[in-house]
Amino acid sequence: MEEERIYTIPLRDVTNKSPTTKRAPRAIRAIREFLKKHMKSDIVKLDNTINEKVWERSLNKIPAKVRVKVVKEGDVVKATLVE
């Protein structure tokens, strides 16, 4: 059964709790952990557009939040950016 949802993932916590040189990698990790928790799956595949959005303004200026569309097919969760 295929399940589809749209989430707004807050990244403000990552900004406030991380040094500037580690924000983008920690933001990607936070997105992955958020989706693992909310979709109840260990296998999370992030689309390249999400990575480009987080890294768009360099390492230390990540967006405050990201909207993603998530599709769960079996045990695999695939996430893409909502424009």
From Swiss-Prot:
Gene label: rpl31e
The Gene Ontology CC terms held by the record are: cytosolic large ribosomal subunit
- Family (UniProt): Belongs to the eukaryotic ribosomal protein eL31 family.
Which PANTHER family does the UniProt record give? 60S RIBOSOMAL PROTEIN L31 (PTHR10956:SF0)
Which keywords does this chain's UniProt record carry? Ribonucleoprotein, Ribosomal protein
GO molecular function ontology, one term from the record: structural constituent of ribosome
Q: Which Pfam families match?
A: Ribosomal_L31e (PF01198)
Per the record, the coiled-coil ranges are none
Q: Name one GO biological process term.
A: cytoplasmic translation
Name the UniProt record assigns to this protein: Large ribosomal subunit protein eL31
Keyword presence, Oxidoreductase = no
Which NCBIfam families does the UniProt entry name for this protein? PRK01192.1-1
